[in-house]
Amino acid sequence: MNYYAIQVKTRGEEKFIRLFRALHPDCSIAIFFPKRSIPVRRKGVTVQTTPAVFPGYLFLETEGETLQSFHWQFRKTCGFYRFLKSNRNIQPLSGRDLETVLHFIKKTGPLAGISKVYFDENSRIVVAEGPLAGLEGNIIKVDKRKKRAKIKLDLYDDSFTIDLGYELIEKAVGLH
């Protein structure tokens, strides 16, 4: 399996997927658009929002040379900007980039939910389960009031931060 990243119009990712599927129903390439669920409080009411984990990026899962046959169909679809690294140098994801993308595609599923965490005796965050598991080293800041953890993600040469929600649980007595 090879995974590729494409850049599309930000906040137009779902529209691009619908349009591409309508124009090319015979395409067997899987298109992934990972999202995250975070609580947002507006005017005293907390609601769950689902923004993108990687705004403006979609990920393609291919087997063999199938991407080459659909290369121009992706480029001609409205909202498409470019393949990564570039349109002339299309390379599959590898190394740390692939690990980060697979964490959100395979481990957490299409929607990264709320992580269950607790704080140790040194006030450091410890993830019990959820999408933050495995990303503890990437946590930059923890906002206890908003119940969000800001993490740093790298994709190709670009580095950006996103917020993931967490739920505080009590540490069991037998755990370390």
Task: Show where each model-derived region lies.
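Active-site-proximal flexible loops/turns
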Residues: E14, E136, R148
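Acidic-enriched and Gly/Ser
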Residues: M1-R124, K141, K152-H176
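Short, conserved beta-turn/loop elements at beta-strand boundaries and strand-helix junctions
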Residues: G130, V142-K147
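Short beta-strand-centered aromatic/proline hotspots
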Residues: L135-V142
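Residue-level "contact hotspot" at macromolecular interaction interfaces
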Residues: Y118, G130-A133
